[in-house]
Amino acid sequence: DKVFSSRILIILFSLGVYGCATDSSEPMAIPEPTDWVTLIDGTEGLDNFNRVGDANWTEEFSSIRATEGNGASWLVTKDSYSDFVIRVEFWASDDSNSGIYMRCQNPEVITDRDCYEANIYDQRPDPSYGTGGIVHRAAVSEPAPTVGDKWNVYRITAYGDRLIAELNNEITADVSDSELSEGPIGLQWAA
């Protein structure tokens, strides 16, 4: 089936935004978001993003899909976010190199140094930052998960300086890092 031959297919991208601060006496307690925003929903999914690069992002069956492009490309949210939960359901091929970029500092030039990247890359040469890791920040837990050729759910929480990546209900990375506090979110397609 052609739908499943793509590098990455994202069927749902929801963003939970925190509306208030928590009690400072419990700094590690992370509340549930107060509001959820669906960024990919039916035929209006691409309207919430700017394109960086030339991947052929298309809307298909209430999802967003990319199958080709020259080099890495991103869909970048038009808004910036500081504290949030991202929930993404996706299908990726086993050779995919993709990721969810967060708190990006320059929405026109996306890098894994100027954003936090929750990786989707089963075949990464250095597996410490493979699928489930936060590149350059938090190595993936062992054993490293694989996501190729099946449906997966990524849930990423950014609250204050804390970043938690959960893949298919397993925590794969958990780190405190205060370098990046706010910015757009990007979805990557890489050749």
Predicted regions and their residues:
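Bacterial N-terminal signal peptides
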Residues: 8-18
